[in-house]
Amino acid sequence: MKNIRHIYYVSENTGLLAKDSGKSLLCQFPGVEFQEELLPFIRTKDDAQRTINAIREKCGEEKPIIFSTIFDPEINKILQHEDVILLNICEPFLTQLEGMLGKNALRASGHSRNVDQQIMSNRVDAIHYTISHDDGTAIMDYEEADLIIVGVSRSGKTPISVFLATQMGIKTANYPLVEQDLTFCQLPEDIIKNKHKVVGLSISPDVLHTFREQRYKGSHYAQMSTCKRETLQSKRIFEKYDLPVVFSDARSIEETATQVAQELSKQWNPIF
């Protein structure tokens, strides 16, 4: 019989921080099998008591591991039961901050929810903007963008833009280089005047050909010669305007989006 360790992620909110942090630690133990469960929205002492009772009943004599991001000391006191191992992810850092700042932390529930609500509001705005400015739509509104991704058609601009909006709250417009741009090696004026927000997205002709063939098989648009010409011209445009460039080949959407965000940071932050 396999030795499986039960893992619980508990939080007063969604529990995503507890889960992400816990998983980052657990992945350092590849030889151990874990059974994980997310228990969000534990906001009262009654919630905590019901939670700990259910965990103890399910795990029996085994000591399960609980990753927590709960601040409330009364709730933590209930969760700190002798039959479980409680790892509060925030507490060590909170204690350090108290020492450095010379002040006691509130350790009160609800404050992080206010932050979460603001983050959610920002992300909703970013998503709305990004969807409304996909594929060169409403280019005259690029002043409001946090980021403008430029690249040839089917290079991955839309999924990367959506990821940046939903996960990072970045208002992202994306613009496809059309035939006129490629022929004259010229960007539209609305992009040029927002050049400090622009990141070029590059892709190899082979990968671009594969993507286009999947959707428009046998078309001139998908031909290798077309893909080679467009990727070469896009490279010339990026060089002409001295734009930062991210290569999307052999990377996941998450990896490419993160690198795009890093390039944006370099544009804004002189330290980088």
Curated annotation (Swiss-Prot):
It holds the Pfam family Kinase-PPPase. Disulfide bonds: none annotated. It comes from the Bacteria. The keyword Transferase applies. One of its GO terms (molecular function) is protein serine/threonine kinase activity. Its EC number is 2.7.11.33, 2.7.4.28. Keywords: Kinase, Nucleotide-binding, Serine/threonine-protein kinase, Transferase. It catalyses: [pyruvate, water dikinase] + ADP = [pyruvate, water dikinase]-phosphate + AMP + H(+); [pyruvate, water dikinase]-phosphate + phosphate + H(+) = [pyruvate, water dikinase] + diphosphate. The keyword Oxidoreductase does not apply. InterPro entries: Kinase-pyrophosphorylase, PSRP. ADP binds at residues 151-158. Bifunctional serine/threonine kinase and phosphorylase involved in the regulation of the phosphoenolpyruvate synthase (PEPS) by catalyzing its phosphorylation/dephosphorylation. Belongs to the pyruvate, phosphate/water dikinase regulatory protein family. PSRP subfamily. This is Putative phosphoenolpyruvate synthase regulatory protein. The lineage of its organism: Bacteria, Pseudomonadati, Thermodesulfobacteriota, Desulfobulbia, Desulfobulbales.
